[in-house]
Amino acid sequence: MRVIHDYGLVRVVSLGDPFNLTYDIEVQCQRDGEWHLYQGFDSLSDDYAYTNAREAAGHAIRERAAEIAGASRC
């Protein structure tokens, strides 16, 4: 596994061999100290997998920020 982009609580990772994995590019979010799949991409069938992963990471960052902001208001 190789971390492509690390945004703190959100990261984009390359898991390696696209021939043996459903998703070889993953956007992951950290919750309770563990990384969870947010959205996956297959670089063999998606020519824009890395671009789409960066866009999905932006959505994940906004969602996590809203969750954290909502939790701190209560």
Name these PLM-found stretches.
Residues 1-30:
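Short N-terminal "domain-start" leader segments
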Residues 32-74:
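Mixed-charge, Lys/Arg-enriched low-complexity segments
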